């Protein structure tokens, strides 16, 4: 009896592990294959702001990627989405200031100050798109985060969603990639 239970447990664990490997491979490939198409707006998802009020490296990489593609005329508007982090800074305000310093016209930057997670960013972006009659967006975030973010946007009935990943890789990505597995299915079941 005990060996049957152990064998079933090991089979289930092996299936889950294989599923994780396949899912993670698909997420990484999807995230690293940018879908660059002219769109109405980019959506830059927030991330940590340092205690000195400057964007952390991951957030800088996202913002720099948005500037690069803006200057290549991929979109007119940049939606910066974030909340107030534990450091006490409004991510969207910090992001906007960074973009203005990089030469993006202030009128072309739209703040979403309630993007506390990817799902809320998708909800808020959907409303912004309706209000401004925008039809297409390009998500800009870390490569491992793109599949789940596209899922959230599709749940908000946003059809034309493309993506570009921030050009930064670090050791913490291992944790983030592992975290994306349960997070993706949490969003799928929302």
How should these model regions be labeled?
Residues 24-177:
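A structural signal for short, hydrophobic/glycine-enriched beta-strand patches
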Residues 14-15, 69, 186:
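Enrichment for repetitive, rod-forming helical segments
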Residues 1-10, 74, 101, 189-190:
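Short, Lys/Arg-enriched, disordered terminal segments
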Residues 4-5, 59, 145, 183:
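Short alpha-helical segments used as structural interaction elements across diverse proteins
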Residues 1-40:
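N-terminal membrane-anchoring alpha-helices
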Residues 173-189:
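A transmembrane-helix-recognition feature enriched in membrane-embedded lipid enzymes
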């Amino acid at each position: 009896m005990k060996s049957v239970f152990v064998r079933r447990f090991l089979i289930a664990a092996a299936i889950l592990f294989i599923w994780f490997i396949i899912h993670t491979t698909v997420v990484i490939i999807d995230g690293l294959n940018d879908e660059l198409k002219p769109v109405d707006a980019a959506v830059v998802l927030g991330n940590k702001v340092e205690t000195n009020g400057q964007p952390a490296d991951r957030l800088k990489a996202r913002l720099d990627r948005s500037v690069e593609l803006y200057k290549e005329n991929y979109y007119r508007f940049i939606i910066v989405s974030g909340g107030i982090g534990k450091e006490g800074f409004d991510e969207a305000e910090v992001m906007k200031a960074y973009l203005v310093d990089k030469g993006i016209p202030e009128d072309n930057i739209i703040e979403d100050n309630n993007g506390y997670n990817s799902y809320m960013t998708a909800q808020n972006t959907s409303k912004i798109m309706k209000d401004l009659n925008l039809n297409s967006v390009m998500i800009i975030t870390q490569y491992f985060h793109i599949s789940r973010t596209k899922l959230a946007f599709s749940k908000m009935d946003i059809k034309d969603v493309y993506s570009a990943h921030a050009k930064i890789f670090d050791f913490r990505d291992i944790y983030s990639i592992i975290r994306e597995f349960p997070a993706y299915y949490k969003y799928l079941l929302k």
